[in-house]
């Protein structure tokens, strides 16, 4: 089942801001003197998001908020996600909340016969999701949105290990200036290189993990991908903690796939 992003809260332009640029409408307006800023600590931190702006209300009142601690998952007859990630020039921005890579149109996933184009991916340190109470060193979120406004997020847990070549390239091109998008046309990447070989997953109904915390369908890959301790440290120097705290499950069903390829 796909969960429709709350269009009552988000105009098409605002949805594009959240999913494509990795910022909220309020954050965009803040730069024009509008709605309040949010952060990961202090008076505008996660425990206060729902009170910062009426459009953030779901952060406080939503019953299917993310991230969650994934446990007691039910085995289910689920099909593999069909990934069709292609090459893209690197477009990267340090938006003040994370490092975000915007993706060239033409890449997508297919879930239950429906196509969801990939619009961006970004990183959190430590992981926002937990598996049986355990966090990973980091997590990568791929954000997809269909033509009719349904959103799917795919989380790939990142653990300390060998150096990751694609992350090395991304880190080497992080802009020094916040909120300045930089395109490196001669640097071509493929997001498929950040996927685990085993693509079994957990899936559940959830939300964006940043304001306005609107509904999103989540797929969390069961197998992590490695990056080096130095690569983790480099990101942590920029963002020591850009992870929303764990949210209540509120009786949500969590399913897990167990297919063999």
Predicted regions and their residues:
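Bacterial Sec-dependent N-terminal signal peptides
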Residues: 1-11
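Alpha-carbonic anhydrase
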Residues: 2-4, 24-261
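Bacterial N-terminal signal peptides
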Residues: 11-22
């Amino acid at each position: 089942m796909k969960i429709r992003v709350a269009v009552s809260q988000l105009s098409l332009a605002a949805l594009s801001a959240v999913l494509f640029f990795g910022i909220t409408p309020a954050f965009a307006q803040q730069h024009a003197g509008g709605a309040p800023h949010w952060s990961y600590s202090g008076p505008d931190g996660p425990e206060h998001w729902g009170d910062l702006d009426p459009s953030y209300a779901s952060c406080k009142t939503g019953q299917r908020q993310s991230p969650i601690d994934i446990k007691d998952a039910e085995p289910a007859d689920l099909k593999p996600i069909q990934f069709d990630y292609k090459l893209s020039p690197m477009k990267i921005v340090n938006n003040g909340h994370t490092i975000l890579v915007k993706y060239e149109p033409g890449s997508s996933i297919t879930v239950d016969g429906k196509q969801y184009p990939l619009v961006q991916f970004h990183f959190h340190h430590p992981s926002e999701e937990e598996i049986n109470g355990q966090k990973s060193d980091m997590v990568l979120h791929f954000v997809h949105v269909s033509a009719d406004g349904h959103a799917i997020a795919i989380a790939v847990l990142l653990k300390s290990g060998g150096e990751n070549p694609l992350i090395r390239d991304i880190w080497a091109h992080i802009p020094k200036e916040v909120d300045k998008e930089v395109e490196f046309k001669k640097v071509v990447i493929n997001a498929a290189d950040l996927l685990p070989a085993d693509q079994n997953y957990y899936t559940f109904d959830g939300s964006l993990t940043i304001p306005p915390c609107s509904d999103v369908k989540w797929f969390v890959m069961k197998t992590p991908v490695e990056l080096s301790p130095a690569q983790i440290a480099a990101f942590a120097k920029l963002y020591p903690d850009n992870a929303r705290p764990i949210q209540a499950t509120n009786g949500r069903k969590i399913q897990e796939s167990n297919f063999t390829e």
